[in-house]
């Protein structure tokens, strides 16, 4: 058993979670875990710095918030961790990921002779076709509305030439059938579907059926949640589904491939990855729809089939699923990197019997992070202009400076550094007899650029002895000056760490 998606229902004070068990969807509920830690010398728990902390556990979110406010003046730990991630860690850590049901889909829309194609935010044109590939049943299904000039009899003759192709007179019936078909899907995925297909479908269902019918795209009777994002410098709107997860396969492809493509159009990516292409046609898609409906159906089906073929080869949905369950995060959280990394750190700290500090809240400002120097170009025509683009800069620097890990054949033993850090962290008594608390691990390193042994070698100190542990198990003792000569002046091709 393992999870698909989850939400925190604050009003009902519960976590609603969906599982996929033996091919069946199972809906569960969990009680949220309201607890955090604060610094306390008498505490039974340890933070990542080795200091003692105490736990506070409450029964409700209201009590939790009150306790957090009471202890606000102290260093707090884990008061800001999402209750969903706490639930996933407690109940699903180490569990296998489920075999998800995925529905790949693609829509085609009508064309208005005066207004043109409609944007997803104002879908005044009807949806003319929806193709869906259900991976759990390996079925490619096409739903379509024939052109106005074509009779249903003629449309059905064309539909009979394809498997699982159904004609509709009313768009409302087609949309309702689509919702029925994807009802058992855990994931909806399309190409550029975050920007187009999902917002168009949600807004069109609202217009043709009702806003209440959009709940059928989600679980737990939830409405799709509006989300704004920026693309090409403009703000756009999409929808986040609940329980049934939407993942844009184009964004997955951009995230998990490491080469920059000249075009991220489905046609270009399919040709590059599969040697396959979309159905070619002459003229506009509107002309194809009205003049060659059979090829239009083939075109719609092929787009969705290409998506299924891409995932069969690349398995990016499986990758996202494994990453989510390895780190006890939700599938949507894998589209970023911060939430996954943070939860992985939390999980590892808990494995070691430690708790992590709350994130430091920084005030938002206009200060940008330091980056590369960017020269402002001088306008005009220039002669002899050159440009150098260094590919794989960091790996190239590592090779050029002989810094690769395989060159490390020994390690300098940090004896003096370890003692220095321990002494800094230890409690101590001053001349007045009062005891003072030592610093934490991070504070012990304040003012140090590197280990004491590293500094001694770089400064070529003659009177400092340093022990080296070699990869073959031997150990030798040298002065810091001798090691400097061995590393930098002996023309050796190896490195000491």
Model-derived regions: residue spans:
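Short secondary-structure boundary/capping segments
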Residues: 119-121, 199-212, 324-326, 400-407
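Conserved DEDDh/DEDDy metal-dependent 3′-5′ exonuclease domain
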Residues: 143-260
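Short helix/loop capping segments that flank catalytic or ligand/cofactor-binding pockets
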Residues: 112-115, 141-142, 198-199, 255-257, ...
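Conserved RNase H-like, two-metal-ion catalytic cores of nucleic-acid enzymes
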Residues: 4-45, 85, 89-187
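Acidic, Mg2+-coordinating catalytic module of metal-dependent nucleases/exonucleases
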Residues: 183-197, 201, 242-245, 249-341
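Common nucleic-acid-contacting/processivity interface regions adjacent to the catalytic cores
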Residues: 286-429
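Non-catalytic nucleic-acid-binding interfaces of large nucleic-acid enzymes and RNP effectors
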Residues: 1-80, 183, 207-240, 275, ...
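Catalytic nucleotidyl-transfer cores of nucleotide-processing enzymes
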Residues: 229-242, 362-497
């Amino acid at each position: 058993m393992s999870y698909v998606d989850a939400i925190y229902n604050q009003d009902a004070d519960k976590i609603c979670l969906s599982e996929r068990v033996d091919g069946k969807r199972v809906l569960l509920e969990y009680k949220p875990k309201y607890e955090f830690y604060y610094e306390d010398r008498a505490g039974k728990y340890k933070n990542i710095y080795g200091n003692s902390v105490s736990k506070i556990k409450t029964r409700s979110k209201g009590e939790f918030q009150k306790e957090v406010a009471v202890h606000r003046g102290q260093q707090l730990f884990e008061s800001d961790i999402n209750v969903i991630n706490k639930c996933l860690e407690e109940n699903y850590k180490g569990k296998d990921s489920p075999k998800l049901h995925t529905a790949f889909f693609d829509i085609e829309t009508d064309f208005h002779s005066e207004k043109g194609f409609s944007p997803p935010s104002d879908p005044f044109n009807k949806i003319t076709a929806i193709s869906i590939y259900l991976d759990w049943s390996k079925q490619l299904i096409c739903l379509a509305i024939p052109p106005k000039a074509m009779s249903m009899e003629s449309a059905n003759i064309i539909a009979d030439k394809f498997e699982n192709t159904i004609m509709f007179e009313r768009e409302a019936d087609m949309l309702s059938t689509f919702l029925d078909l994807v009802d058992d899907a855990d994931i909806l995925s399309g190409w550029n579907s975050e920007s187009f297909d999902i917002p168009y479908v949600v807004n069109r269902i609202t217009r043709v059926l009702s806003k209440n019918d959009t709940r059928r795209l989600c679980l737990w009777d939830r409405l799709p949640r509006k989300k704004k994002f920026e693309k090409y410098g403009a703000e756009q709107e999409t929808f986040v589904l609940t329980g049934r997860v939407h993942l844009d396969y184009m964004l997955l492809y951009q995230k998990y491939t490491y080469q920059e493509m000249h075009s991220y159009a489905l046609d270009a990516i399919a040709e590059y990855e599969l040697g396959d292409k979309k159905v070619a046609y002459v003229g506009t898609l509107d002309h194809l729809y009205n003049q060659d409906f059979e090829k239009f159906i083939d075109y719609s089906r092929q787009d969705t089939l290409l998506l299924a073929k891409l995932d069969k080869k690349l398995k990016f949905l499986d990758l996202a699923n494994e990453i989510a369950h390895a780190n006890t995060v939700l599938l949507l959280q894998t589209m970023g990197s911060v939430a996954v990394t943070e939860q992985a750190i939390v999980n590892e700290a808990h494995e070691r019997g430690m708790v992590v500090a709350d994130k430091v809240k920084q005030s938002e400002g206009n200060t940008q992070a330091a980056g590369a120097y960017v020269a402002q170009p001088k306008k005009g025509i220039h002669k002899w202009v050159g440009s150098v683009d260094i590919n794989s800069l960091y790996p190239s620097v590592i090779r050029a400076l002989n810094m690769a890990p395989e060159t490390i054949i020994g390690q300098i033993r940090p004896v003096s550094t370890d003692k220095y850090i321990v002494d800094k962290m230890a409690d101590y008594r001053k001349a007045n007899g009062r005891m003072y608390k030592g610093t934490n691990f991070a504070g012990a390193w304040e003012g140090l650029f590197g280990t004491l042994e590293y500094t001694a070698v770089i400064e070529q100190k003659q009177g400092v002895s340093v022990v080296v542990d070699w990869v073959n198990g031997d150990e030798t003792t040298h002065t810091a000056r001798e090691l400097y000569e061995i590393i930098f002046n002996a023309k050796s091709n190896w490195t000491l760490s």
